[in-house]
């Protein structure tokens, strides 16, 4: 803990339960729910609520475990924007689509909400699926794989999915897919050290309109700024790079962040609790067990349009284990809350608090 920084990371709770490494955490966008996935082939869900009326302290409770039926590691988990559907990506090459029985908008995400049921299994990848994600409209789902492809699926009524494109732009394993927060722009990151950006041509198909090069090793993770004007990427080269949209289809590298001694496996860009002038808070984590929290701010300088200030840092977040995932809570009242998943099988919830 760095006392010379303005904030610290306070551990809210440990959430044990996975029998093997925990790979990813995902907050439900509409309900007080958190999901995690693991090498134990399961997805666990947790609800949270204030400990007392008006209190900032939260109580997390295990709601249920989805025995996904995947035959190998569940590597990725993602919520649809409605909060009612969950997608899982597995090393068995398949993508599972899950819905909860008898779910209603009035329930409080407790045990009475019904069991999760696999409504669709999407097949097509030849080998390990590494990442899944829904577009902001909820009408598209992307998946990527060690088979070097990115698939885009159209979400249709009654849990029907149609493949809209198989994108074969990367020359190596594709590690991550991330949708723009408001537009139908998809980004992917790869073992080939590049980031690809895709859009749909109404007269043609989905295509790659830009390749962002600059990382010197595997690109592990991507996260868009909340307003979508910037894209952050993290890499095996121990850097985070931030890219700015300078034209409709043109992105330019503007800032590099350092602060890790090993691969940066996961990043998450949230709105934060700062002033309206800043672009939010960027959390980074990885193989060195550190979590760094950066405040990103736009400047008036043409040559250096962004500045970054380290707000908080913690080492050994999961003891001696790698940290595989970090994610900010999307609910504005909890914009200072983040979750992590580690090789120790634990999910942890943290809050950024001023010293």
Regions found by a protein language model. Name each.
Residues 43-48, 95-100, 150-154, 177, ...:
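WD40-repeat beta-propellers
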Residues 37-40, 88-92, 137, 143-147, ...:
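Conserved strand-to-loop turn within each blade of WD40 beta-propeller repeats
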Residues 25-31, 77-83, 133-139, 178-184, ...:
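Loop/turn segments within WD40 beta-propeller blades
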Residues 37-59, 102-103:
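Beta-propeller domains
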Residues 327-355:
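Blade-level signature of beta-propeller repeat domains, shared across WD40, Kelch, NHL, RCC1
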Residues 15-22, 66-74, 115, 122-129, ...:
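WD40/WD-repeat beta-propeller blade N-cap
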Residues 2-19, 58-63, 114-117, 308-311:
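A short helix->beta-strand "capping" segment at the edge of beta-propeller domains
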């Amino acid at each position: 803990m760095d006392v010379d920084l303005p904030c610290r990371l306070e551990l809210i709770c440990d959430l044990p339960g996975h029998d093997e490494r925990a790979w990813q955490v995902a907050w439900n966008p509409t309900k007080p729910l958190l999901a995690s996935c693991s090498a134990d082939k399961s997805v666990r869900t947790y609800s949270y609520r204030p400990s007392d009326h008006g209190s900032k302290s939260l109580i997390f409770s295990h709601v249920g475990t989805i025995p996904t039926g995947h035959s190998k590691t569940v590597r990725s988990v993602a919520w649809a924007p409605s909060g009612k559907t969950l997608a899982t990506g597995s090393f068995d090459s398949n993508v599972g689509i899950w819905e909860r029985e008898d779910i209603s908008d009035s329930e409080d995400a407790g045990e009475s909400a019904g069991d999760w049921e696999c409504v669709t299994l999407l097949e097509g990848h030849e080998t390990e699926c590494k990442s899944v994600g829904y577009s902001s409209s909820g009408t598209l789902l992307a998946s990527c794989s060690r088979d070097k492809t990115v698939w885009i699926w159209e979400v249709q009524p009654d849990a029907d999915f149609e493949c809209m494109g198989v994108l074969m732009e990367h020359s190596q394993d594709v590690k991550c897919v991330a949708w723009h927060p408001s537009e139908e722009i998809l980004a992917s990151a790869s073992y080939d050290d590049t980031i690809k950006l895709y859009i749909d041509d109404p007269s043609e198909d989905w295509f790659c309109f830009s390749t962002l090069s600059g990382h010197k090793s595997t690109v592990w993770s991507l996260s868009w700024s909340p307003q979508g004007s910037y894209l952050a990427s993290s890499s095996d080269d121990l850097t985070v790079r931030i890219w700015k949209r300078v034209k409709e289809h043109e992105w330019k590298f503007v800032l590099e962040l350092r602060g890790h001694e090993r691969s940066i496996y996961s990043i998450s860009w949230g709105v934060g609790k700062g002033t309206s002038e800043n672009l939010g808070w960027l959390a980074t984590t990885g193989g060195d067990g550190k979590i760094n929290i950066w405040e990103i701010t736009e400047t008036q300088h043409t040559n250096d349009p962004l500045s970054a200030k380290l707000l908080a840092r913690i080492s050994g977040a999961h003891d001696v284990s790698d940290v595989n995932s970090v994610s900010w809570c999307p609910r504005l009242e909890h914009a200072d809350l983040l979750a992590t998943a580690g090789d120790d099988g634990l999910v942890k919830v943290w809050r950024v608090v001023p010293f």
